[in-house]
């Protein structure tokens, strides 16, 4: 593909050099540049691609895309393209390089603090059951029809993302459902993608380590809807007071869903048990295998999205009633002595509260024992809040490590302990080692009790000082219950 084809629709400031030259590869990592490559100089969190322009020209790059022109004597035969926003240009160029794969799919993006993974996973499974070849891009995994590609971020970088979408098109997929994180919107990783629709679930306290203020976080989520085309749909949870903010400037056709008020798609939770929930959806009663009020919202969002994509209401509900939750989302193990252990990815205050409220409604006279930690190098303000919420709903709380990353685990625990009120101190233990913490919870539990192990969900590792060690809450729980004879 030639340079002129790659910069189609890119907002250009200047072009110095030929544009009728072939490009064999595109990259934003200077280490991957080879002769014939186009290098896009992107400003990252820890490094600036502009610092490596001289290096990539020496390596034989055919073209360089940048915001600031390089201060070097000679650019050889390299075409220099100046743009206003190189991160946005990267998205557009990646889309052009892979022949605009998103335009050949019905691509739906899901954003919000909680529920993204469950929602996209349910949509993926639903559309498979409806007979479509479907792709999935999620925190847990990326799937091309039925081929799993492991995920490393909620939203991959623009080049990886377009390659995945191109592979989906090649595999015959007609639909793709993807999580869209606030980071991805701000970093322009979704620039150049053509969405058939966007879905907003809710917004609560998260990622303030990156966005700094809650207003900035809201604006980051809103960016996604601002960029939707006029032939797409924007579906919002109208029970979240910030839902309307998301669609203030969107060109998309807007729709709402709600459990509490009038909306385009209306649901009402009838009952919920540890086996599932019954809900009225647009006047039709149906039973689902998911649990809790928060999942009623996820199910309603999935139903509404499917209908907006042209599917039959009754067929959607019938197929949706057969689908189970995503891995690590309210995932249950029941021991020989009838102790229920729930593993959930809840790693924000709101998500933890939702899960514990659901367990409280269903527990009867039995105890709730919560094991919870907070990740390192992430929003520290939520740490005492998470501990406080765990105490409010639990009979025993074991504070522990999550993914400490590059922070000291004890320092994170100390910050969590600040959220424990004097009246709750007797019910709280701090156990630094996560496996030991789960063991303590299992030891405290008796027949009928419920243990919640929160924070990591589907993850199969624990990240400490830059190293990911094998660690799966679900396997640890099974091992400990068997060892303890519980």
Curated annotation (Swiss-Prot):
Its EC number is 6.3.2.13. Carboxylation is probably crucial for Mg(2+) binding and, consequently, for the gamma-phosphate positioning of ATP. Its main location: cytoplasm. Keywords: ATP-binding, Cell cycle, Cell division, Cell shape, Cell wall biogenesis/degradation, Cytoplasm, Ligase, Magnesium, Nucleotide-binding, Peptidoglycan synthesis. It comes from the Bacteria. It is found in: Cytoplasm. Belongs to the MurCDEF family. MurE subfamily. HAMAP family: MurE. NCBIfam families: murE, PRK00139.1-4. This is UDP-N-acetylmuramoyl-L-alanyl-D-glutamate--2,6-diaminopimelate ligase. It comes from Cytophaga hutchinsonii (strain ATCC 33406 / DSM 1761 / CIP 103989 / NBRC 15051 / NCIMB 9469 / D465). The gene is murE.
